[in-house]
Design a protein with these regions (language model features):
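Alpha-helical transmembrane segments in inner-membrane proteins
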Residues: 1-337
């Protein structure tokens, strides 16, 4: 227990360091003493520095923190519920559903959505469409979960929904303008920089609500690790638990995808890294460790995006596979061995 507590402490320290580096590093060099002062409310005479730290770097660091924790927790819950090491937030087509809605807005509706007297355009339209579509796919999966008792069948249904969405997106890309296709591809690369300071309270509240709900389900998750029959013998309502897990996962995935785009590999790889770190399947330790590790990995990926010296920014989905893919290959080879 002491060793695990030490690992958690080191992980928290690692997150704090990465969070600080995310506030320091960028295309514009802001000295550490001024960054520290700006964060605590002592703004400098340089308005550009104030704007960069408060309006740009702080929201981006908070977004990475929340997004990493949300996707990692979602991945762990799905892997446990379906006893599948390759289950992740995108496996049920939730990401694909959000991507389809964004494709419709960007490629078919010209970047705007009109509902009676309400007209949404630009980022607001994309945010609205992706969130609504992701939640719609979640409710479809939830409806199937009440009828389909077999986990494998439910996974296949989710994969098929993803294929259907991808097919429609391909058709939309074929008939779209070059500018529309370019805009959609940029959104699909993912970014932690799309959440403004004004949207941060809503984004963080939604993510924290989902994470708190996931922590409440620690005991049922522990029971599910030993199989559905064993869980039922302990008095766990497996169907109800699976429904709740899908609802929480859908909420977390919908929020993160709507604001950040379809971020790959974090939800798939981080739970495995957390298992290696903690050496346990007890979700009382594993779930908090997964959330913290997800926060750290997302902050690290966000930091790596700013490595180019010429001021350009690497897309987040160009970084996450470099970390996630080797982990998945290692896990699969270890299981095979």
């Amino acid at each position: 227990m002491r060793l695990t507590s030490l690992k958690i402490f080191v992980l928290v320290l690692f997150i704090l360091i990465l969070f600080g580096l995310n506030l320091l590093i960028g295309s514009v060099d802001v000295p550490f003493k001024y960054v520290r002062g700006i964060i605590v409310g002592n703004k400098t005479e340089n308005e550009l520095w104030n704007y960069i730290v408060i309006e740009n770097r702080l929201p981006q660091a908070l977004t990475a923190l929340c997004c990493g924790g949300a996707l990692s927790a979602s991945g762990l819950m799905l892997q446990t519920a379906f006893r599948n090491p390759l289950a992740g937030p995108g496996i049920f087509g939730i990401n694909s559903g959000a991507a389809l809605a964004v494709a419709v807005v960007m490629l078919f509706l010209g970047g705007s959505v009109s509902i009676e007297t309400v007209n949404l355009s630009g980022f607001t339209a994309i945010l609205f469409a992706s969130f609504v579509s992701a939640m719609a796919v979640t409710f479809i999966i939830l409806a199937f979960s009440t009828r389909v008792r077999n986990n494998v069948s439910l996974l296949i249904i989710g994969i098929m929904i993803g294929y259907l969405a991808s097919s429609v997106i391909s058709l939309l890309n074929f008939f779209a303008t070059d500018q529309g296709v370019k805009s959609y591809l940029i959104w699909g690369l993912g970014s932690f920089g799309g959440v403004s300071l004004g949207n941060i309270p809503f984004f963080c509240t939604m993510v924290l609500a989902g994470l708190v709900c996931s922590l409440v389900l620690v005991k049922p998750l522990n029971a599910l690790t030993l199989g559905e029959q064993y869980a039922q013998s302990l008095g766990v309502n497996v169907a109800r638990t699976r429904f709740l897990l899908l609802a929480i996962t859908g909420l977390l995935t919908a929020v993160t995808t709507a604001f950040c785009g379809p971020i790959a590999f974090i939800g798939l790889a981080v739970p495995h890294l957390a298992r290696l770190l903690t050496g346990t399947e007890d979700h009382r330790t594993l779930l908090p460790a997964t959330i913290l590790l997800g926060c750290g990995v997302a902050l690290l990926c966000s930091l790596l995006c700013y490595l180019p010296p010429n001021g350009s920014i690497i897309p987040i989905n160009a970084i996450t596979p470099l970390i996630g893919a080797p982990v998945i290959v290692y896990i699969m080879m270890k299981r095979r061995g």
